[in-house]
Amino acid sequence: MGSRLNFKSFVDGVSEQQPTVGTSLPLTRQNSVFSLTFDEFQNSWGGGIGKDFGSMNMDELLKNIWTAEESHSMMGNNTSYTNISNGNSGNTVINGGGNNIGGLAVGVGGESGGFFTGGSLQRQGSLTLPRTISQKRVDDVWKELMKEDDIGNGVVNGGTSGIPQRQQTLGEMTLEEFLVRAGVVREEPQPVESVTNFNGGFYGFGSNGGLGTASNGFVANQPQDLSGNGVAVRQDLLTAQTQPLQMQQPQMVQQPQMVQQPQQLIQTQERPFPKQTTIAFSNTVDVVNRSQPATQCQEVKPSILGIHNHPMNNNLLQAVDFKTGVTVAAVSPGSQMSPDLTPKSALDASLSPVPYMFGRVRKTGAVLEKVIERRQKRMIKNRESAARSRARKQAYTMELEAEIAQLKELNEELQKKQVEIMEKQKNQLLEPLRQPWGMGCKRQCLRRTLTGPW
């Protein structure tokens, strides 16, 4: 391959020699095991495991899937490449095996492939397994999905359908569908600018020479380049700005759905994990309730701060987005008065600050009298209870004083008796000492005793 680019292929207008590659789009999934059902995967890769996939937890299932995917990709390294090329434009579609699982590479240029986009599935690090289901068994996750489907079918049918519908079994579901519904795969929105228009990196060329066209079947729901300078122009959005606001809302909501319907089925079949389609909006979008006239909501242009002062009444609420300049007008359902009948004073009054009121009910005279009477009764009761407590305290004090007086008298009597008893004992001890010798007693005489035999 050379190093030159074929600039002749970048022409405005759709080339008649470009073939439709709609038949080669399923090549992105023919080398992936994610398109197999559980039964096919069990029959093909479950022989060496010796364990049913339904009894495994989600961690083991992912490990087995990635092991099978790696072995499958290693077997596909020698797969020959199939080229679908355009003679004049130089657009080449290459489908091959290798580590790029179900890869799809697209080359642009006459002799050199200067741009390649991979539609392959990323490796194991891209799949984030939630902690809530990492240790759950596959059968348990499948039962939860079936319960959600039953609840959804009951809500849609309203419980009126009496015909039992056949439920899909786990063996009939593909690995891709199971992982998406179980929440293992997180789809990220793809930016519009990455696939909107590709002109080879040169200014002044149209969008027909690149990949950002709907004619070659690679990019769906992309606008055509009408300016010739690589900038996508949405003619429908330009015309929608001049229409009334009531007619603009259904157009902005329904138009992306009408464009997505022809290509949505093809995209869901060609990719293992389809990306979400990003809807491009205009610079300023006004969404108004259909029940109100368009004169109530004024268009808000994005400014430095993104906020403009607009007249507002009690039934209109405007919110301005700082990035896209989106104006949302919400109308209160409680008031259906026409804006023509609304007086100007009401609009001026709505701009004034709302007083800080809690809506207290004014009390009447009877209520006040009842409150005063209740307070007086409470005061009387408090006084009576205080008087009773004081009387009890006084009586208790008097009883204590009487007991103290009695104890004092008894103490005095006991002290007197003690003094008398002590005097008597003292007198009894002193009486023998007061009597003289010879008086009242006989004098003893000495006598000679025999002390020997003579």
UniProtKB/Swiss-Prot annotation:
This is ABSCISIC ACID-INSENSITIVE 5-like protein 6. Keywords: Abscisic acid signaling pathway, Activator, DNA-binding, Nucleus, Phosphoprotein, Transcription, Transcription regulation. SUPFAM superfamilies: Leucine zipper domain. SMART domains: BRLZ. Expressed in roots and flowers. Signal peptide: none annotated. The modification Phosphoserine is found at residues 32, 55, 126. Residues 400-414 are annotated as: Leucine-zipper. It comes from Arabidopsis thaliana (Mouse-ear cress). GO terms for cellular component: nucleus.
